[in-house]
């Protein structure tokens, strides 16, 4: 019997269904979390073979000891997943420590976490991306902005969603940003005038698609956050062929296997010098493993 460790199986609340189906498919499902066992949904308790409570999932040493305990008791761990971007690096660290090969280890995380590193994999897939620069200070930031032209977009090179994302339209905006930013590494990109089209699906252990879908987001998350607008998206009945081709090429370039995937692309609203023509597909958030779930 294979051993599957599920980190924080009670969050989101619906994740008990993953545990149930893992058990139904012959896995030994071992949970690690910081919620008391009696607080877990009955459906989750019924789906777990054992649960190890830690005082805090933020405490790496405690979680490490929990994995070590399960390893001692049940033998080699075959899978370790949280299906939660917040724990992405920690999951990779534990896989590295315990040589769990069914998910990314620490040496594979750059292409997953850093937007600047994602771009070369988009290039490998033959998909253009916005020109970018890793900000060091005011002088180089202004130089890049003047090279590509305003507006430019800045955001953490490693980050989730639109957190700390800014659209800068003038030199004064760049000066404000440099004066007020935190110590994180920021990536500055040329602004892309387009709507977001996603490629979503399930990839099997051989890298082949089992299921494909997608949606359109007319207004970017950045604009929604910065303007306090409404979040709107809708599913497409049929994926445009150019999005499907881009999605399949990206999955292959990143070497994705045994995951759910959520890939984001811009579709240009108009011709844009240096990027492409109206309707062209531009790489956005490259395989954002934020939305990659273990399958």
Predicted regions, residues:
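Short amphipathic alpha-helical segments and helix-helix/interface helices
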Residues: 16-20, 119, 142, 174, ...
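Conserved small/polar residues in nucleotide/adenosyl-binding loops
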Residues: 290-295
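ATP-binding N-terminal substructure of ATP-dependent carboxylate-amine bond-forming enzymes
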Residues: 1-107
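Internal nucleotide-binding/catalytic subdomain
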Residues: 167-281
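Short acidic-hydrophobic, aromatic-tinged amphipathic segments that line or gate anion-handling sites
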Residues: 51-57, 133-136, 168
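Activation of the activation-loop gatekeeper triad in protein kinase-fold domains
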Residues: 287
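Hydrophobic anchor at the start of a short beta-strand
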Residues: 29, 129, 186
């Amino acid at each position: 019997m294979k051993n599957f460790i599920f980190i924080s199986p009670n969050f989101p609340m619906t994740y008990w269904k993953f545990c149930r189906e893992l058990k139904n498919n012959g896995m030994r499902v071992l949970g690690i979390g910081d919620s008391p066992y009696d607080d877990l949904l009955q459906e989750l308790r019924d789906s777990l073979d054992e649960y190890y409570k830690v005082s805090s999932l933020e405490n790496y040493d405690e979680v490490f000891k929990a994995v070590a305990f399960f390893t001692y008791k049940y033998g080699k761990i075959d899978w370790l997943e949280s299906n939660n971007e917040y724990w992405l690096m920690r999951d990779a660290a534990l896989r590295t420590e315990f040589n769990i090969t069914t998910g990314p280890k620490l040496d594979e995380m750059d292409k997953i976490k850093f937007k600047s590193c994602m771009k070369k994999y988009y290039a490998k897939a033959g998909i253009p991306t916005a020109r970018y620069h890793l900000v060091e200070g005011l002088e180089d930031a202004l130089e890049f902005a003047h090279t590509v032209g305003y507006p430019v977009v800045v955001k953490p090179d490693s980050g989730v969603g639109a957190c700390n994302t800014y659209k800068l339209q003038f030199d004064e905006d760049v000066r404000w940003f440099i004066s007020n930013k935190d110590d994180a590494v920021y990536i500055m990109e040329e602004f892309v005038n387009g709507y977001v089209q996603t490629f979503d699906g399930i990839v099997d252990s051989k890298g082949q698609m089992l299921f494909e879908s997608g949606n359109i987001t007319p207004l970017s998350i950045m604009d929604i956050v910065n303007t306090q607008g409404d979040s709107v998206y809708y599913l497409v009945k049929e994926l445009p062929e150019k999005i499907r081709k881009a999605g399949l090429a990206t999955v292959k370039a990143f070497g994705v296997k045994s995951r759910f995937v959520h890939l984001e692309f811009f579709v240009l609203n108009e011709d844009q010098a240096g990027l492409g023509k109206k309707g062209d597909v531009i790489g956005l958030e490259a395989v954002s493993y934020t939305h990659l779930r273990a399958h």
